[in-house]
Amino acid sequence: MKVAYLSSAYLAPVEYYSKLLNYDKIFIEQHDHYMKQTYRNRSTIAGPEGELALSIPTVKPKEPKCPMKDIRISDHGNWRHLHWNAIESAYNSTPFFEYYKDDFRPFYEKKYEFLTDFNEELCRLVCELIDIQPAIERTKEYKTDFAPNEIDFREAIHPKKDFHRTDPEFIPQPYYQVFEARHGFLPNLSIIDLLFNMGPESLLILQKTCADSQ
């Protein structure tokens, strides 16, 4: 049985969902120390001007090393409104935005207290829309020793790291993108880029992203 360990992630990239599809068991880390500038609170979409990072503000923890499970979402800067406007602006001309938008909009209207809960519920929705059924559990403690069948992707899947180097089993697959004529194909964006552009065919693309499927 193949087991993957992942960090919590906000509208995670295609690489992340490739693991959800291709591993038999997924553990989402709850006890790692929270770090900004990671997919824990950041997602990358494609707009008219190219890649655009969306970051969720968080409440500064009292302790310098705060477990991810205790990180609270801040209401600073009207971020929900800004994120939804950015998503709408980037994807309202895609083939499937109108079809899926009412599934996503409520996440930007409801206030969630904890970042992990917000990320988890969004992930559950995306899995349902793509039609994958990963076996996911939250970790009960921070794991440092891994069996041969367990792979640690908690820091490997990172917006500042080159997936070609850190994750050779991930093979990005080109698909239709609205702004491709301007910027060329942009690989490994947020899963919503794939979903809004490809709709039900997202699963077919995702199935090809694992080296084992080549």
Where does each model-flagged region fall?
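Residues lining hydrophobic/aromatic ligand-binding pockets adjacent to catalytic sites
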Residues: M1-Q214
